[in-house]
Amino acid sequence: MVSACASPVAAYSLPAWAAAAAGLFLFPAATLLSSQARVRAERIIYAASWVLVLLAAHQRLDGVPRPPSALLNANAFAGTILLLLPMAARRKDWVLTAGLLVCLWWTRSVGAWLGLSAAVLLHRRSVGPAAFWAGAAVGFAGLVAAYAKLHSPEVLHRVEWWMAAGRMAVSAPWLGLGPGSFAYALPAHVAARPELNSLYAHSHFLETAAEKGWPYLLVWGAGLASMLRRAQPSRRFGPVAALVHGLVDYPLSIPGIFWLFCLSTALCLPESDEGAAVRGTRKIPAAAFVLVLAWLAGAWTRDNWRADRLRAKAAESFLAASEALRPHPEAARLRAQLLLSRAGEGDDVVAAGHLERAVAMDPYRASNWVLLEQVYSRLGRPADAAAARARGARSCPMLQKLAPVRVLKGGPA
């Protein structure tokens, strides 16, 4: 909290702190869960695992080479799979386990496979010799694949991001630059190249040091080591794999995956003797305290949403006034992007109209045609999407070489 308030970009750090705090809250909360409550929590995760696998299979059959399932992208899905695999194995659901491994193969995440291999090698006694040698083979193949990519942009860019995170951590060693600040501080620590823009450092520990300071990183690392060292092998397998994956990728920077990681790690802790019971004389004050906290959190979140909508409306008003004076393709595109951020079907229809005007005024910008095709696909109008692609290809022949757009979730792909 202190790091967020003292951040040079506190407006961005405070929401990121709230997301991180929600994950940290799961550690004490999990110890208060009874055995039955823990079983129910695992059942929910188990059901969600099946949903993710089936959705990924549907996407794969639909022609998506690296299906992200319901996650941000394939890399995020890979990080989630590492946390779900041990739960499937504990329940002896080998069909789900196989499905998760197939999905992990589809993601093509070398870092995730290295994380899985490292977890297998570290748990030699519990996984058995066959799994141990299979993990060793997978790890060797992963290292070969990583070596083959050594001079590829994705590796070279990671090195730049890691070095930038290190410089940030040195510049603010005690409190860091604030949770969620990496993307906003990055331009000051790397060369001005568009391909180096990134929301995350692609390294959990370096990003933690840069955003929250070295003392926090030491406490966080020591706490995780203490909890995982005493945990049952089947419980710590997933968090260990996710942490190794987090050395070279960003899934633990995504709130939902971080919460799953925190819950998986927290369930390694023994059940508290006190349980979640509250003495009779304290029930009303405790309930009132929880309700007040919930109301404050809800009010804070509501105000953030209102502020975001007001900013969007203000920008829309300025752009509309600008176009009323002189129509411009860039203004039309920006108005469409603002509407698409609201994710309402009516907004999508209006956004399509703005994009039609943008391509009419500037038919040579390929990204406008692609965005228009995405909007029509999201609206369930494949004929219009295909027509937009054909019209765009007449002005931008490069569009003929691109694969057709497939919209998978609630926003443009």
PLM feature segments, named:
Residues 1-4, 17-29, 36-148, 210-248, ...:
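Alpha-helical transmembrane segments of multi-pass inner-membrane proteins
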Residues 144-159, 285-316:
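Hydrophobic alpha-helical transmembrane segments in integral membrane proteins
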Residues 160-198, 205-208, 212-218:
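TM-adjacent membrane-interface loops and short helices in multi-pass inner/ER membrane proteins
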Residues 311, 315-318, 343-356, 380-389:
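Structural signature of tandem alpha-helical TPR/SEL1-like repeats
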Residues 321-324, 357-358, 391-392:
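Canonical positions in the second alpha-helix
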Residues 325-329, 363, 397:
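Short coil turns that delineate tetratricopeptide repeat
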Residues 331-334, 368, 401-402:
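TPR alpha-solenoid repeat register
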Residues 339-342, 376:
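Residue at a conserved register position within TPR or TPR-like alpha-solenoid repeats
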